Regions:
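Short, well-structured N-terminal submotif of metal-dependent ribonuclease cores
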Residues: 1-36, 48-62
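Short loop->beta-strand "edge-of-pocket" segments that line small-molecule binding or catalytic clefts
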Residues: 3, 31-35, 66-71, 109-111
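Histidine- and aromatic-rich ligand-binding microenvironments
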Residues: 5-6, 36-37, 92-93, 114, ...
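A generic structural signal for short hydrophobic patches within well-formed alpha-helices
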Residues: 10-11, 41, 78, 117-118
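Amphipathic alpha-helical segments within well-ordered protein domains
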Residues: 45, 62-65, 82
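Short, hinge-like loop/turn segments at secondary-structure boundaries
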Residues: 51-55, 88, 127-131
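Active-site neighborhoods of divalent-metal-dependent phosphate/nucleic-acid chemistry enzymes
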Residues: 69-113
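Acidic, PIN/NYN-like endoribonuclease modules and their adjacent C-terminal/linker elements
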Residues: 100, 104-132
Length: 132
């Protein structure tokens, strides 16, 4: 595994938003599929719920979970998230720090559309920004 998809990348793919093509390219690599954080499950559900589409969550999440590896939240990631938040000079939500830290401790590239991840120093995280 070389990439971890942030929730923003999963949502871009699911809703065919800008950056979806880059996520699709990563998902096509059957030998080395990307991962997602277990936190992405609740963020994806929250997005569907906010759009009034909560009922489709189970089937859609199952479909996503079949093509990615789901990474658990570990104590090492929690510690790294604290280090990352301390190093950021700008606001970085805790949930995003935990997702970034999961990629960081696994030494894989975080794929995202959230500009606020760019406050994370390169010594902590490899990033692929798929936003506009």
């Amino acid at each position: 595994m070389t990439h971890l998809l942030d929730s923003s990348a999963v949502i871009a793919y699911y809703f065919d938003e800008p950056g979806a093509d880059q996520v699709a390219f990563l998902l096509e690599d059957n030998r080395n599929p990307p991962a997602v954080s277990c936190i992405t499950e609740i963020e994806f559900w929250s997005r569907l719920r906010s759009l009034g589409d909560e009922s489709s969550f189970e089937s859609n999440w199952k479909e996503i979970a079949e093509i990615v590896s789901i990474e658990p939240l570990t104590t090492n990631a929690a510690t790294r998230a604290r280090e990352i938040r301390h190093a950021c000079q700008e606001r970085l939500p805790t949930v995003d720090a935990l997702i970034a830290a999961t990629a960081s401790v696994r030494d894989i590239t975080l794929v995202h559309r959230d500009p606020h991840f760019q406050c994370i120093p390169a010594r902590f995280l490899k990033q692929l920004y798929i936003g506009q």
